[in-house]
Amino acid sequence: MKMVLSQRQREELNQAIADYLGSNGYADSLETFRKEADLSTESEKKYGGLLEKKWTSVIRLQKKVMDLEAKLTEAEKEVIEGAPTKNKRTPGEWIPRPPEKYSLTGHRASITRVIFHPIFGLMVSASEDATIKIWDFETGEYERSLKGHTDSVQDVAFDAQGKLLASCSADLSIKLWDFQQSYECVKTMHGHDHNVSSVAFVPAGDYVLSASRDRTIKMWEVATGYCVKTYTGHREWVRMVRVHIEGSIFATCSNDHTIRVWLTNSKDCKVELRDHEHTVECIAWAPEAAASAINEAAGADNKKGHHQGPFLASGSRDKTIRIWDVSVGLCLLTLNGHDNWVRGLAFHPGGKYLVSASDDKTIRVWDLRNKRCMKTLYAHQHFCTSIDFHKAHPYVISGSVDQSVKVWECR
């Protein structure tokens, strides 16, 4: 369909083109264009930069149109499938939906971890570029970078109050950062013999746990920076450590295909979980709110009795997600659907859903009660490496090998 410009619009466009040619040094083209368009040699100031402004406006409008089209497609799909619409969903049913609210760039290498601050409207990303970046997830604004590591930053974790940030790196160190005022590194701990792959605070905040490729887990005293315990038992690289909210136990997963649950106050392994067929990349403790959905799903699979938990989810390179009752060492559910390694897990605060990130470039939302994938988001251009679900606000964040961090609104 041919677009017809009015005489005034045609004159403005010609003046804007002339300004663009002149300001970019295309003198010969400008002279020819002025003759053919019958323009004076003087250009008015109001046309300065007009062509660029129009062009960027078109791009912005195009993105808004694409976002609206994605939301419309989403709404139409829900109507067809009979899913509850936004107005009928309770906050406990809100899940991440496309398109992303923000796509944040600035890192120069793969994103290894993304986490929310427990109190403020901030999030943190760690990267193989050896930096940690802080962002405002509500506005999408970049705040600052934390620099000090000399190799890939593998994991980050906040204490319960969000006053301290712990980070660990392939440079064999664990660092503690003041997250209240200075944003400076206040302690550096050394003791591992290989890549430090994961960190986690115990709930009281007085100790930090670290997991390493040297096959050990270490406990560090925050006040002194001293290593006070070393836990051994895994036969290969320990990929992740996560502490239960009560603090008395923590879980680790490994390249040896197992998950171990440890007693925090001793060096004893409480239980070893052994059903995965490949490296276990990630783990996540289920909130208490998830117990009823997990029990209902387990009941459908004839897993006898009412399970008390605690419950733990694990994601593996075997492309499966498993949910365990760690008190009895039993796998209650297996979730199949990803086409590649499962790299990140996060429970919905309401307990009904689990979200996962995978090397198949997707984020999937799992309905625990029905043991099915209810939503697939084609989230990134490359492997999805990490995911987090905010405990109080309707947001999910994801990180990727494509060097971007994305913020997803739940509705």
Swiss-Prot record:
WD repeats (start-end): 106-147, 148-187, 191-230, 233-272, 275-334, 337-376, 379-411
The keyword Transport belongs to this UniProt entry's keyword annotation: yes
Annotated keywords: Cell cycle, Cell division, Coiled coil, Cytoplasm, Cytoskeleton, Microtubule, Mitosis, Repeat, Transport, WD repeat
GO cellular component terms listed in the entry, alphabetical order: axon cytoplasm; cell cortex; dendrite; dynactin complex; dynein complex; growth cone; kinetochore; kinetochore microtubule
GO MF term list: dynein complex binding
GO biological process terms held by the UniProt record: border follicle cell migration; centrosome localization; centrosome separation; chorion-containing eggshell pattern formation; clathrin-dependent endocytosis involved in vitellogenesis; dendrite morphogenesis; establishment of mitotic spindle orientation; germarium-derived cystoblast division
Coiled-coil regions listed in the entry: 56-83
Keyword Disulfide bond attached: no
Domain LisH as annotated: residue spans: 9-41
InterPro entries: Dynein_regulator_LIS1, G-protein_beta_WD-40_rep, LIS1_N, LisH, PAC1-like_LisH-like_dom, WD40/YVTN_repeat-like_dom_sf, WD40_repeat_CS, WD40_repeat_dom_sf
Subcellular location: Cytoplasm, Cytoskeleton; Cytoplasm, Cytoskeleton, Microtubule organizing center, Centrosome
Domain remark in the UniProt entry: Dimerization mediated by the LisH domain may be required to activate dynein.
Family: Belongs to the WD repeat LIS1/nudF family.
Protein task: Positively regulates the activity of the minus-end directed microtubule motor protein dynein. May enhance dynein-mediated microtubule sliding by targeting dynein to the microtubule plus end. Required for several dynein- and microtubule-dependent processes.
PANTHER family from the UniProt entry: WD REPEAT-CONTAINING PROTEIN POP1
Protein name: Lissencephaly-1 homolog
Organism phylogeny: Eukaryota, Metazoa, Ecdysozoa, Arthropoda, Hexapoda
Protein's gene: Lis-1
